[in-house]
Design a protein with these regions (language model features):
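RNA-contacting regions in translation and RNA-metabolism proteins
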Residues: 1-168
Length: 168
């Protein structure tokens, strides 16, 4: 739900006093459970709202694959996923995005594995040692093309880089 009037609480209005409105609709639907979710034009906020009451720690949006990595603490994992995956499935249907729920530890492991792959590519193709490849990864470089198109003077600004490193 959404309201264009900032003075109105759209969720509270739909739910009613002590749930009277939503209970009336639920009774009409033979006791079907109803969630009232606050709509947002921003994907990250809409996903957070759709997974409520689970508390989301971080969100990583992958526009290319139309997926969202939702990172939660260990104690929030079961709440975010729901019984039999029901919560995450409903949130994915509602938002139109593929949702991947993971713990902070799983996200860190995944990030480290991705960094390791990038680091190995840099070592293999740029003829640099692992320490230099680590510096490139820490600076946010993810592809060979990104490194190739950065002016030499910008690479020299990276701590630990000198002219001999940049020439490689």
């Amino acid at each position: 739900v959404k309201s264009n009037d900032g003075r109105i609480d759209p969720q509270g209005t739909c739910i009613g006093m002590r749930g009277s409105r939503v209970n009336a609709v639920s009774n009409e639907l033979n006791g079907e459970r109803i969630d009232v979710v606050l709509w947002s034009p921003e994907t990250a906020q809409f996903v957070i709202n759709a997974l409520s009451p689970a508390e989301v720690s971080r969100i990583l949006i992958d526009e290319d694959n139309h997926s969202v990595d939702v990172i939660v603490t260990e104690d929030q994992l079961a709440l975010a996923i729901g019984r039999g995956g029901q919560n995450v499935r409903l949130a994915a249907d509602l938002t139109g995005w593929q949702l991947n729920i993971m713990t902070i530890e799983e996200a860190d492991e995944r990030h480290e594995a991705e960094d390791s792959v990038i680091r190995n590519v840099f070592v293999a193709h740029l003829n640099v040692d692992e320490a230099t490849a680590d510096l490139l990864v820490q600076e946010g470089f993810a592809t060979l093309e990104e490194v190739a198109y950065v002016p030499a003077n910008e690479l020299l600004e990276i701590e630990g880089f000198d002219e001999s490193t940049v020439e490689i």
